Structure formats: structure tokens, C-alpha cells
Amino acid sequence: MLRTGDMHPDTLSRRTVAFVNIAHALDHFVLLIYPTAVIAIAAERGLDYGALIGLATGAFVAFGLFSLPMGWLSKRLGRRNLLAAFFGGCGVACLGISMTATETGFAVWLFMLGVFSAIYHPIGGAMLVTHARQLGRDLGWNGVWGNLGAASASGVTAVVAATLGWQAAFAVPGLVCLAVGAAFLALVPEDGEGNAQRKGSAGVIPVSRPMVLMGIFALAIIAGGMTFNVTTISLPKVIDERLGLALPLALTGSLATVVFVFGALMQLAMGRMVDRFSLPSIFVGISILQPMGLGLAAMTTGVPMLAGLVMAMAAIYGQVVVNDAMVARYVPAEHRATAFSVRYFLGFTTSGFAVPLIALLHGQGGFAVVLAATAAFGAAIFLCSISFLMVAQPRLNAGNVAAE
């Protein structure tokens, strides 16, 4: 086994960032297998979509709830060890889902998948900021990896489920998680100190009213958690019902993948902008696209609906980069793991209600109602961004600026 002393810090940082990026892709991939596979499961077993999708509620609640203690655990167990547990736990949970035959089994294993998936964002986010060479660029590329995981989940799951069965759609990613985890343990010996003081690392931005600013940001995170999860979870079924074409499952999943790809492109753009422009101004510009895109998707079908989803998904995933940059730029280094834990706890725990909300609203009026409600959450984010811009005035005393 390698030791930190045997490895140049640059090598350790490059390897750490590489595995953090892969973990981000796998995190979003494994959580979004079920929303596509459930279409095949429902058809095979003759069960209602609303009832089956509701079994994933525990996974998404756990995804947020168990992110909260990760900052505390990282100080005791180490970030590297927790990320290794992420790889192993997600792999075992996916294999468990592939072998279950009951609705209770689905609920239990999906819950376990949510527990281990909760490790990534607070731990991976803190590791990325620590080892990043250029914050905005590395956050942008990390976002792309996560988005590609989400994007490929729909298409890959649809193809595998249609050709090999839905069980294989869980088993194959489970084995991949275990293999990547073994490689991570072998190639990344410890946490390391990273690139915290190197070129491209920005200092913490001092503000005059930090508590008010964080309160506004918290509200935006909660609303953003709803738009993110409702949209990503329901996307394959939205396309299936509202595109206006009778498409096979594989093609439906592929179209969902195309929509996610636009989100990845926006994340690259956001990464570049974070290194060049004011974060509050970027926040306003990206957030207005969410209610616009979701509103268009709610009011239309066919190609216009697809265009609205593209706009919304680009904004939703671009917002993720902005949010992570906010934590990196407004929170001191020693508190970042805890800050990332709270950030994802707020976003993902609240959005754990996304699954029952989808089921409830879909039963009341289809996806037009689901998308309209999501657009309302998007409008709330835009209002928060305006408030954030007004409050985020730096302190006048430059001597108080802290370095990361």
C-alpha cells in the first residue's frame, strides 16, 4: 500500500480529483437507475408506476438526511476512508436491489443505496476544493462528471433493461462501484494537504451580514433541491408521456440523456464564469432560466416541451456549480466539510419529498401539474438570488479578508 510520503503532492491531488470526479458520476448514476428501471419493472409485474416510484422515497430522504453527519465523521474517520465506504456501500446496495423480488426488498435496498450515496457530496466536495488547482474550472469539470452520470443513467439503464433485464441494470453498476473502490484504496493512500495555497485558490469573501446571507442561501438550496430532484427523477417519464410519440424504452432513455448533456455543457460554462465574475451576479443570471424552462415545459408538449426541459436542466445543473463555489468562497477551509454537509442536508432531505410529490401531483393532473409546481420552486430560487445580490456586500475593511 502506498504511503503519502512516497507520493508527490501534485500526484496525490491529481489522483484524488480524478477519483472524486468518478465518484460524482457514479453517485448520480446509481440513484437514477431506479426511475428508469421502474418503467420496465412496472411493465413486467403489471404494477402502477406511482406505487413503484414511491418505493424510492426512502432512498432520497436518506440521501439528504445522512449527509448531515458526514462532516463530523470525516474529522474522525478521514475523508478518504469515507469515500472508500461510498464506493463499497453503493456497490453492495446495487447488487442487493438486483436480487430482490419483493416491494419491501426494493424499499430496504433503495434506502441503503441512499445512505451510502449521501457520503459523496459533503466529502467529495470538501476533497475537491482542497485538491483543486483552479476552483471554478475544477468545480465545472466535477459537475460535468456528475451530470454525465445522471445523463447516462437513463440511456444505459434503458438499454440494459431492454436487452438483459432490469436486474442487470443494477448488477453491472454495482460491480463497477466495487472495482473503482478497490482501485481508489490502492492508489490514494491518505487525505493529504492538497492545493489549498496554490495558484487559482481564492480567499474567503468577507461579508457584512453573513447570517442573513446564509439564510437566503439556505432557502435557495431547499427550493433548488426540489427542482433538481423532481426534474431529474421524473424526466424519463415526462418524455415518455408528453413528447407525443410512441417511443421504445431505450429511445426514451436516450432522449433523457441528451437533455442531461446540455446541463453538463452549462456546468463547464459556469466553471469558467466562477473564476471571472461575481458569484451573486452569476447566481441571478442562472436562476432566472429555471422557472422559464420549467414553465415552458409545463405549458407545451412535443418539441417545445423538450426545449423547455433543456433550458431548465442547463440552469439546474449550472446552479450546482454556483452553489459549491459559494461554499468554497464564503466558508473558511476548516469548516467546509461541515458546510457541505449542511448544504446537502438541506437540499436533499427537503427534496426527499420530491418522490411522493411526483406521485401525488401526477395522479391529480399528470406531468403538466408536476412541472408547473416545479416552476414555482424555480421562481422562488430567482427571488432568493435577487435578495442574495442585494445582501452580499463585502466588508469595507480589507484587512479582515481571510486566506484559505
Report residues per predicted region.
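Cytoplasmic helix-loop-helix junction between adjacent transmembrane helices
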Residues: 109-147
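Central cavity-lining transmembrane alpha-helices of secondary-active solute carriers
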Residues: 57-71, 257-269
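Interfacial helix-cap and linker-helix signal at transmembrane-aqueous boundaries
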Residues: 41-42, 73-74, 159-164, 239-240, ...
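Extracytoplasmic gate region of multi-pass secondary transporters
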Residues: 34-35, 213-265
